[in-house]
Amino acid sequence: MGGRVSKAVACCCCRSQHHGVVVESSEKTAEEDHGESYELPAFQEFSFEQLRLATSGFAVENIVSEHGEKAPNVVYKGKLDAQRRIAVKRFNRSAWPDPRQFLEEAKSVGQLRSKRLANLLGCCCEGDERLLVAEYMPNDTLAKHLFHWEAQAMKWPMRLRVVLYLAEALEYCTSKGRALYHDLNAYRVLFDDDCNPRLSCFGLMKNSRDGKSYSTNLAFTPPEYMRTGRITPESVIYSFGTLLLDVLSGKHIPPSHALDLIRDRNFNMLTDSCLEGQFSNEEGTELVRLASRCLHYEPRERPNVRSLVQALAPLQKDLETPSYELMDIPRGGATSVQSLLLSPLAEACSRKDLTAIHEILEKTGYKDDEGTANELSFQMWTNQMQDTLNSKKKGDNAFRQKDFSSAIDCYSQFIEVGTMVSPTIYARRCLSYLMNDKAEQALSDAMQALVISPTWPTAFYLQAAALLSLGMENEAQEAIKDGCAHETSSSSGH
């Protein structure tokens, strides 16, 4: 009866409570298997200003972490120089009081490079600010795909792939001297552009002084951690066992309850009903047996990561099918710009038609500024403010007359005073720079407009035009798609 676990598993589980299993190691190292030929830039230290700009001023719209703004440490999505997508974790100010310890830990984790990890690209340590920068994974978490799916449940071959890749990630980290992973759970497993599962690098870093390695419900923490408050490599294996249960059941079942179900041979409660007919008794038996070994009360009786990999590898199915097909998700943002219904401005920017862009910006005026360029408090009415307004008016007139060099000068005067903030001014100066073949300055202005207004489609479209001028077509298409997504969301009232 496929999709149900046979009663024979009870015998396996009972035996595993008393006997460890010795597995011969394979000849290949974890690095050769999972880290080879994976090229990324070297770890670097970023300035706070770089990351502020990359995340549009740490905009709420860019938060991707589970609990949003309420989380003690918030994760944002962003783009470095409008090119590489990144995830930025901003720590609570009290999380890392010792800047030297933070830098040492970050640099150590930043040496890891594997296609099984969402790798750490860099960090920032300025004043009280502590931030980590990692590869951005666009296709959600394992928790989302297992517990909160919408269209369809994750297929059995994909579930097997997830746990194998996760075991390989842990094996690679262990081979590099980073065997400890803090609070391993379904939210730590992310999916990349190709929908391949990756282990978040953030769990590899922990401030030893804060005394907490598990933020989840205590029902899921290893028993030895409850006794000693310390995490060991065997504790990570225990957490891996809870993930095996998640994958098998499609639910977040407390380990003690799961072990009771196994002892009582109540396997129907342990397996996801959505998997009916997708796997054999033998496959289910092996996964439950492996989970029960990982959840052994005695840490020394749990398997090591290499034996996990060797146990899971033979179970793999549909090896030639890409993960994005198993998940029924378009590959790497596979939606082409050509297939999108583009607004006139998006169309003009996608063709880098600067004349058409100018006409649209001139016609739109300052409608998108929501009054930021016009609402002045009483105390602002000074001679300096009058000069500022005059520079704006002169800039607008030059922009209208297509005297783009003068427009740049006048808008720059307005921006330098800094008493008013206008995304439209940056948009107009951006186009003026493009008209003068200054694409890098144009890109900077488009990004600054996004800092002021993080969901403004015009800023994304102008960013695309600047990227096209720099010969960065793929990045330009991503910017167009981002702008279209925000424009669609705005028009639908979300």
Swiss-Prot record:
Phosphorylated at Ser-213 and Ser-215 by BRI1. Phosphorylation at Ser-215 is required for its function in the regulation of brassinosteroid signaling. Phosphorylation by BRI1 disrupts the interaction between its TPR and kinase domains, thereby increasing the binding between its kinase domain and BSL1. Residues 61-316 form the Protein kinase domain. The active site is at D183. SUPFAM superfamilies: Protein kinase-like (PK-like), TPR-like. One of its GO terms (molecular function) is protein serine/threonine kinase activity. Keywords: ATP-binding, Cell membrane, Kinase, Lipoprotein, Membrane, Myristate, Nucleotide-binding, Phosphoprotein, Serine/threonine-protein kinase, TPR repeat, Transferase. TPR repeats lie at residues 423-456. It is a lipid-anchor. One of its GO terms (cellular component) is plasma membrane. Induction: Induced by 24-epibrassinolide in roots and leaves. The keyword Acetylation does not apply. It comes from the Eukaryota. It is found in: Cell membrane. Interacts with BRI1 and BSL1. This is Probable serine/threonine-protein kinase BSK3. It comes from Oryza sativa subsp. japonica (Rice). The lineage of its organism: Eukaryota, Viridiplantae, Streptophyta, Embryophyta, Tracheophyta.
